[in-house]
Amino acid sequence: MMSVNECLTDESNIYLIKGKYIKLDENNHICAEKTDKKIYIKNFNSTEFIGEELCHIKNIPSAHYFLVGINYSHHRNQFKKYSKLNDQSISIKLGSFDFKKDGLNYFKIPYDLCNKLITLEKILSLCPNKKNRNELLDEIIDMFALDIYMGQQDRNESNIMFYQDKNNYIHLAPLYDFEFSLNNALYSSKFLYDNDLYKFKDINTIKEFISSHERLKYELESYLDINLLEIARKSYNERDLKIPSVIEEHYTSFDHIQKKLIKRIVK
């Protein structure tokens, strides 16, 4: 939607790394290896900041996103203000530290014996007891509500991750990859909301899901009280970035459109 240069200020914090560390990981994600943590790197997209902030408000775990400066010759592996950089022509991307914790088994949506991705009910059936099943279902429904509000178009096997703890309880891992959202032009002509766990083909499909999972209705209604522009401003301010006025107008319009959609769903 915009370049990082439109948003930078002298106070913007940038994490500096050396370019030679950059490579593809096993999932073809660009990443940088450090001695302590792996950093996933992608092109600048401020929707990641907003998705993260919405997750914080809704108590949904998410990846943390920050600016990364690549091929900087001094003071690597630390944050530095943009005004303090000797070379301000460096390549600035978006980064997030690997959120995986030791002792937990992380996995993506599994395939069944017919080589098809398993559905919501099948992933829930992997839970060891009813308590864990209900916990995981609530976590997934909260993801559904967030994504519907944000207009997420690609919540699929590449960006849905789960983890299993030492008690074999299964939970949704932190959410990440919000870049295909907050943009009406990205809307699929086939799906209102595309998720590999459950296909919401239209509003009626969502209503049918709500008839047996009322939590989705309440979660969607909670977004009617959220001001997307305020969320965007907060997420930019926390990173000492400026938000272009044209983008503010876009977020205001998008917020209005999504709230009209939610009202149609929950009425």
Which residues make up each language-model segment?
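Short amphipathic alpha-helical segments that mediate assembly, nucleic-acid/protein binding
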Residues: 116-120, 133, 216, 258
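C-terminal catalytic region of ATP-dependent kinase domains
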Residues: 56, 163-267
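Conserved ATP-binding subdomain of kinase catalytic cores across diverse folds
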Residues: 1-111
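Intrinsic structural disorder
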Residues: 1, 15, 134-135, 267
